[in-house]
């Protein structure tokens, strides 16, 4: 039986990942910030907001999946920016300290990250070979998160970092926010409309994470985005067609920045990111083009 330890296991990605893992011969320990009782013998919860939580984590953990982090979908006040950073750094460091104090380290750590690692560019195509230093607040979060995760290599753990693109899911996240203006017939181009949206269907993301965990030759950063990113204007048009709604309005960049503040960088300052490394290992995307992905999600 394989032993999993998961942070962020009750979130959008984590909950679907748990549902997939429990189909196998496994036991899953989920770290949460509040008390929960499991009605499934394959799942147990540990409240790591309480002192002594470390002693409740099984000794023989094989796989650690670190998804913990405050949502980006809130206005980035100075206080919340600190929350965004610390929620990721402190959880990752706590995991490292836990296993550093033990004789047995996990075989593999899968640590979430984001395509915000790469600088915004309308013409550059980014693959995993591109290296950079932080250039804005979001990239600093990503850079520090990955740096803290890489400490696990000192324990002999294989470290896999998944740089998530825009996750398309019916269970929350970006797609629900994107659909809202179209439901009120006011969807359209945002800013220039030329910025890239590097997206991924939630089902492909879950399968990609498990693929990387189970592939012993996988290590380092992986771009977890569909093979065909789209520019925002075409993305919006494709979404409108799937919803049978118009795509006619335009919100200037200045208005977006005034409305959203620094959070507007997630919408306006984006990157064209390609999943070369995971494809080279043989992973195949079920939803490789946007039309197919949106039609699957909108029809449900």
Curated annotation (Swiss-Prot):
Cysteines engaged in disulfide bonds, as pairs: none
Matching InterPro entries: DUF1731, Epimerase_deHydtase, NAD(P)-bd_dom_sf, SDR39U1
Transmembrane segments: none
Family assignment from sequence similarity: Belongs to the NAD(P)-dependent epimerase/dehydratase family. SDR39U1 subfamily.
This protein's name: Epimerase family protein SAR0825
